[in-house]
Design a protein with these regions (language model features):
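Glycine-rich phosphate-binding P-loop
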Residues: 281-282
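Conserved protein-kinase catalytic-loop segment immediately C-terminal to the catalytic Asp
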Residues: 285, 290-293
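Phosphate/dinucleotide-binding and metal-coordinating scaffold of catalytic cores
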Residues: 1-274, 278, 292-404
Length: 404
């Protein structure tokens, strides 16, 4: 028997789709609210011959290829199967998709939600559910937070959950203790941005357990009912451009089409790419470059605060790992490729970087980080600062030659 669902953006009903177990069997898009389609699904509108079966004045009916696009969007919204402690979230005889749909697929980072045809819930009630967030004490002492619907749309491999502290919403990312260095990178990145005088970043702090060992990191939420997160992946996927060699250059252009300041986007991308290079963050993929969109006008207002600078578990310490040939899970395959796209190395003030002692003091809080690995990371930091200085000199000489 098929289940019937409606996809909404706030109060706008966008489409109706049917689900047979985990398979989407049909979808009808409401043309009256077509502007509210999730950005990746707007690819349908640019390629109707490929994704549309029938179109009339009021609706668009998707063909099998169109249903695959919708399925991909839903899959990206649910928690991934490689999530740490996945089985704590997903009960027996259930799966991530059904758990998400049971909880209306709402998220704290955007205004989309999904309702079963048999439910009578409205958007005001969804907002109440969004606000039903545990405070930190109850979260860490009660495993039931794993099952709260507010966490059913949190992506990424690391275990994470929303909570409230002094009335403000925060995100906690947890990691096994042997990978505490991932949290250290978030804290180091925060220190670098602070010293640069750059404000548009998530200020991460360590989360420690009762024996004072690092088990995660936390930061304030930066989205709300009026400001939602869209990613570089969303912008690229709309035009099927995620695999292009010039994605670094395409992202600011596509963001500008929706209202972003192209120059500011370019500057922030250059800065975060350089900082990632300094701290060996190997995970700045398309989903980790974000923008804040006005949820009413659907226009980009600004770049999102820089988030997720900690790298990823499966690449921690993996070779090749050196000055330029380090493999990354990013816009390109290696750091060397990524650095070749940076427009302006002078966006970083090297004189304001944290000292090696300041970086070491952060690493020292990670007791599972071996002394050998710590010294290697500190060596990389110093070596990479020298590299950036040289790139800045090369660029300044090049600019001087152009003026002559």
């Amino acid at each position: 028997m098929e289940d019937k669902y409606y996809l909404y953006h706030k109060t706008k009903q966008i489409c109706f789709f049917t689900l047979d177990k985990q398979d989407i069997t049909s979808c009808i898009i409401n043309k009256a609210n077509i502007n509210y389609l999730p950005i990746p699904l707007k690819r349908i509108l640019h390629n109707k011959d490929e994704f549309v079966s029938i179109e009339n004045d009021k609706s668009i009916i998707l063909n099998d290829e169109g249903l695959i696009l919708l399925d991909c969007w839903l899959s990206d919204r649910e928690i991934p199967v490689n999530r740490d402690n996945y089985n704590k979230y997903i009960k027996k005889n259930n799966n991530a998709l059904l758990w998400m749909l049971e909880n209306y697929a709402y998220s704290l980072i955007d205004c989309y939600w999904i309702n079963n045809e048999n439910n009578t819930i409205n958007y005001d009630e969804i907002l109440l559910l969004k606000d039903n967030i545990d405070n930190y004490i109850s979260v860490i002492t009660n495993d039931n937070h794993y099952y709260k619907g507010i966490n059913s749309t949190l992506g990424g491999q690391l275990e994470k959950f929303w909570y409230k502290s002094n009335g403000r919403v925060k995100l906690c990312k947890k990691v096994e203790k042997p990978f505490d260095v991932i949290n250290a990178r978030e804290v180091i990145a925060s220190l670098i941005y602070t010293k640069q005088g750059f404000r548009n970043f998530c200020n991460y702090e360590f989360v420690k357990d009762k024996v004072d060992e690092v088990i995660g990191c936390k930061c304030f939420a930066f989205t709300n009912e009026n400001n939602e997160l869209i990613t570089a992946y969303d912008l690229l996927e709309e035009y099927n451009l995620t695999q292009q060699d010039n994605v670094y250059e395409l992202i600011p252009k596509l963001a500008a089409k929706l209202g972003a300041d192209k120059t500011k986007v370019e500057k922030q991308m250059d800065l975060e790419s350089i900082v990632d290079f300094l701290i060996l963050n190997r995970d700045r993929h398309q989903g980790n470059i974000g923008f804040l969109r006005n949820s009413n006008t659907l226009k980009i207002q600004s770049t999102a605060p820089i988030y997720d600078s900690g790298s990823c578990k499966h690449l921690e310490g993996v070779y090749p790992e050196d000055l330029l040939n380090t493999t990354i899970n990013g816009l390109y395959n290696t750091e060397k490729e990524l650095l070749s796209h940076i427009r302006d190395f002078s966006v970083l003030d090297v004189s304001k970087l944290p000292s090696i002692e300041e970086i070491k003091s952060i690493y020292d809080e990670c007791i599972y980080l071996s002394e050998k690995r710590k010294q290697k990371l500190l060596g990389y930091y110093e070596e990479r600062i020298k590299f950036i200085k040289n790139k800045q000199l090369e660029q300044s000489y090049s600019d001087y030659d152009i003026i002559l």
